[in-house]
Design a protein with these regions (language model features):
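Acidic/polar-rich alpha-helix caps and helix-coil junctions
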Residues: 1-63, 67-72, 77, 83-186
Length: 188
C-alpha cells in the first residue's frame, strides 16, 4: 500500500507517539470485564442486537456447562496455543486481553474465547488498528507507536527489536483475535 498516506491518515487520529488521540477517542487504561472490546477505542462498529444469541452456540454458557468436549459447535483454543500467543516478554507484563478474553471450560487443555460475551456490536475500525498502521508505516517512530499501545494493554515497553514488522504482527494476532483484520496483515 501507500505507506506515507496511511501514516498521515493514522496520525490525524493518533497524533505523534506518546500523545493522546483526538477526542472523543481514548486508549484503555485498565482491564474491565464490562469493556472487553475497549469501547473507548472503537472508531466504527455495527450494532448487532442478537449478537449474544448468535455467538452462544459457539462460546456461550450452555456450551461451557455442557462441556466443550460434548459439543459439536463449541469453538475453543488450546491452552498451549493461547500461552504461545500471549507469551510474556517481560516479567511485568499483565496483558489485559489475556485477562479478559478467555473463559475456562471443563477441558484441561482448552479455553473458549470470551471476547464477545455480553457485547452488542461488531468492531470495524479500532484506535489500536491506527497505532499498528502508524507503527508499520513509520521507520523512525514505529517502535514508539507500538510501545504507546503496549502501555495501554498492560505490557512493558520494548527497548529494541530486531524485526519490528514481526512484533507488529504478533500484536495484531492478539488484538484482533476472532476478527477479520488479520487478513490485512497477509502482505507482511
Amino acid at each position: 500500500g501507500n505507506l506515507p498516506d496511511a501514516l498521515e491518515a493514522a496520525r490525524e487520529i493518533v497524533g505523534e507517539p506518546g500523545s493522546e488521540p483526538v477526542a472523543p477517542f481514548s486508549l484503555t487504561t485498565a482491564a474491565a470485564t464490562d469493556e472487553r472490546l475497549f469501547d473507548s477505542e472503537l472508531l466504527f462498529a455495527l450494532e448487532e442486537g442478537k449478537m449474544q444469541d448468535n455467538i452462544d452456540v459457539y462460546f456461550g454458557e450452555s456450551v461451557i456447562k455442557n462441556g466443550i468436549t460434548n459439543s459439536s459447535t463449541a469453538l475453543s483454543i488450546s491452552i498451549n496455543n493461547r500461552n504461545k500467543l500471549f507469551a510474556q516478554q517481560d516479567p511485568a507484563d499483565d496483558d489485559y486481553r489475556l485477562k479478559l478474553w478467555f473463559q475456562e471450560t471443563n477441558s484441561a487443555t482448552a479455553v473458549m474465547p470470551g471476547k464477545y460475551v455480553n457485547v452488542g456490536c461488531i468492531p470495524l475500525i479500532r484506535l489500536s488498528e491506527l497505532y499498528y498502521i502508524a507503527a508499520e508505516c513509520s521507520a523512525n517512530q514505529g517502535l514508539a507507536y507500538l510501545n504507546t499501545l503496549r502501555a495501554h494493554r498492560g505490557l512493558a515497553a520494548m527497548t529494541e527489536v530486531t524485526d519490528l514488522q514481526a512484533e507488529i504482527a504478533k500484536e495484531y494476532s492478539k488484538e484482533f483475535m476472532c476478527e477479520g483484520q488479520m487478513l490485512s496483515l497477509i502482505h507482511i
